[in-house]
Amino acid sequence: MPQNPSDRRPAPRDNPGTNAYEPLLSAEVRAALSTGLPVVALESTIIAHGLPRPRNLSVARELEGLVRSAGAVPATVAVLDGRARIGLDGDQLERVAGDPAVRKLGHRDLAPALAAGADGATTVSATAFLAARAGIGVFATGGLGGVHREWAENQDESADLRLLARTGITVVCAGVKSILDVPATLQRLETLGVPVVGYGTGHFPGFYLSSSGEPVDWTVHSPEEVAEVIRAREALGGPVGALIVANPVAERDQLDPVLHDRVLAQALDACRERGISGQGVTPFLLDQLTRRTEGASLEANLAAVRGNVTLAARIAVAAADAR
């Protein structure tokens, strides 16, 4: 009987030592960091698991191109052959985009994946951890994980939140997906001491939507202002943690709010009718949102990611110039 691809055993390592598990930086990323050039980390889960093939590869290349156009160096993060890689070449990017056996890796999965010689695409928690460890100060993603609906019954919360509370990196995102419990997520970030600033907005974005309706305490209006916040945090010292820059998708690119609210209400009703609960809720809601909006939610997702990547690169450039 054929094996599950995720169960395949890799060839044993030759004399594996501590260095065998050190993240491997591409020559371009290493040179940029050593000379103080701006670098932006990018996650790979959106490439391997978030988009249909072959569009995922073209989007991956597009996002790296947006970083370069803004004057920074892209560092897409992934695990290949049991080695964390920060900065991928063209062949490696194609491998992540084209191999269905590439696993989804959060921070907790990194050590087992490295030891097993596995291939994996990194989520927000894994990417933020590896990027910060390499000395990269800015990371762009679509949206953060957060507190899930029905938290009181199942205590389902993304690992992103705790990891960001102890990882020194600036994360540019479009908030959290509106299928999550947005007020509870913001409360959790406050409890964990993670600052959130709205970029050009007084409200926390709703990922597919420009606004979730929830206010933010601080607003910045330029990459230079964000760079100044980064400098102030570094000068203050104290506990290490992330800075969240919440960048709303442009109103012209957001999912139609009326359509969003109607589809989400229908999907929540379907959840209750089918008895779906716990960890099954979020994947079900995401699938329903994609299907019932006929792909419009995916386009809003991509618009948000593009905006975040461009802004992250501009912030990285401003932070490098301020040093």
Curated annotation (Swiss-Prot):
Name of the featured protein: Pseudouridine-5'-phosphate glycosidase
Function: Catalyzes the reversible cleavage of pseudouridine 5'-phosphate (PsiMP) to ribose 5-phosphate and uracil. Functions biologically in the cleavage direction, as part of a pseudouridine degradation pathway.
Family classification: Belongs to the pseudouridine-5'-phosphate glycosidase family.
Catalytic activity: D-ribose 5-phosphate + uracil = psi-UMP + H2O
Pfam families (UniProt xref): Indigoidine_A
Cofactors that this protein relies on: Mn(2+)
Keywords associated with the record: Glycosidase, Hydrolase, Lyase, Manganese, Metal-binding
Cofactor note as given: Binds 1 Mn(2+) ion per subunit.
Residues holding substrate: K104, V124, S158, A159, D160
Entry's Gene Ontology molecular function annotations: hydrolase activity, acting on glycosyl bonds; metal ion binding; pseudouridylate synthase activity
EC number, UniProt record: 4.2.1.70
Quaternary structure and interacting proteins, as annotated: Homotrimer.
